[in-house]
C-alpha cells in the first residue's frame, strides 16, 4: 500500500475506503450538472483534492465525458485507493502532489479517530488543532507552474476540495485564474487557525477576478450569490461566459 507504517485499524479503514470507492454514487448529481453547464462537451478537468476518486467516477458518467482529468491527491494512504478507483478510466492522470502557494514540501496532517483509523476527509496542510495526527511530508507545486509544465492551454473546470487551503492554491494560480479562465467548483471551508486568511478572502479573490458565484441548493438548482455567508461548495463562472449559459 505504501512505505508508511499503518496500524491494524488504519489497514481495515483502507479496505473499507476501497469498497466505498467502488460502490458509492456520491456527488453524481452535482457532477453531472457541472459538466452540463460547461461550454465544452469534452472538457479538460483538474480535480484538486481528488481523495478516493468519487467525483472522477461521477464525471465519467456524464454524456459530456471529459477528454482528460488531472487528479491531485498528496496523501500516500488515500492516493493508493485513488489509483485503484480510477484505473479503468483511460482519461485520468494521477499526481501525488499538493498544489500550494510555493514549490517544495509541506506537512500533511491526517487526523486520527480514537480507534486509530484515519479521518480521511479531514486531512489538511496548515496548523493543527488538538488531537492525534498521522503526518507525512508531501511535495508541493504552484498550480501555474504545473499548468505550464504540462502545456495546458485549455482547462474547462477546476474542482478544489482541500480542507481550508483553497486560498493557498489561488496564490499560485494567478495566470490560470486570469488568463486561462476555467470554471471553478470550490469547497470553501473555514480556515481559522491554519492560514493568515479566511474564507471571505477566497470568495473575494474570484469576484475580484471578474467571476460570478453560484451554489447548488436543496432544490438542485444553481443560485447566484453576491457575498460569502458561510462555507459551501461554490461554482465560479467567468462573467464573460454568462451570456447564453443555462444556469
What positions do the PLM features span?
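Phosphate/nucleotide-binding beta-alpha loop and adjacent structural elements of enzyme active sites
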Residues: 1-247
Amino acid at each position: 500500500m505504501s512505505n508508511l507504517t499503518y496500524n491494524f485499524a488504519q489497514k481495515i479503514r483502507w479496505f473499507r475506503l476501497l469498497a466505498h470507492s467502488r460502490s458509492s454514487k456520491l456527488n453524481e448529481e452535482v457532477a453531472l450538472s457541472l459538466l452540463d453547464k460547461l461550454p465544452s462537451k469534452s472538457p479538460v478537468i483538474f480535480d484538486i483534492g481528488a481523495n478516493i476518486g468519487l467525483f472522477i467516477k461521477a464525471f465519467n458518467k456524464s454524456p459530456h465525458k471529459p477528454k482528460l482529468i488531472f487528479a491531485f491527491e498528496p496523501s500516500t494512504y488515500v492516493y493508493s485507493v485513488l489509483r485503484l478507483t480510477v484505473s479503468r478510466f483511460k482519461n485520468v492522470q494521477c499526481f501525488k502532489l499538493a498544489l500550494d502557494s510555493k514549490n517544495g514540501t509541506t506537512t500533511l496532517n491526517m487526523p486520527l479517530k480514537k480507534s486509530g483509523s484515519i479521518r480521511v476527509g479531514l486531512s489538511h496542510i496548515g496548523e493543527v488543532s488538538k488531537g492525534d495526527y498521522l503526518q507525512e511530508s508531501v511535495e508541493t507545486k504552484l498550480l501555474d507552474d504545473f499548468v505550464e509544465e504540462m502545456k495546458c492551454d485549455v482547462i474547462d473546470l477546476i474542482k478544489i476540495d482541500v480542507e481550508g487551503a483553497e486560498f493557498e492554491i489561488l496564490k499560485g494560480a494567478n495566470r490560470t485564474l486570469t488568463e486561462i479562465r476555467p470554471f471553478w467548483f470550490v469547497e470553501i471551508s473555514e480556515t481559522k487557525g491554519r492560514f493568515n486568511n479566511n474564507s471571505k478572502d477566497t470568495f473575494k479573490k474570484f469576484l475580484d477576478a471578474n467571476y460570478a458565484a453560484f451554489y447548488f441548493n436543496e432544490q438542485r438548482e444553481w443560485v447566484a450569490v453576491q457575498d460569502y455567508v458561510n462555507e459551501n461548495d461554490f461554482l465560479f463562472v467567468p462573467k464573460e461566459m454568462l451570456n447564453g449559459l443555462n444556469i
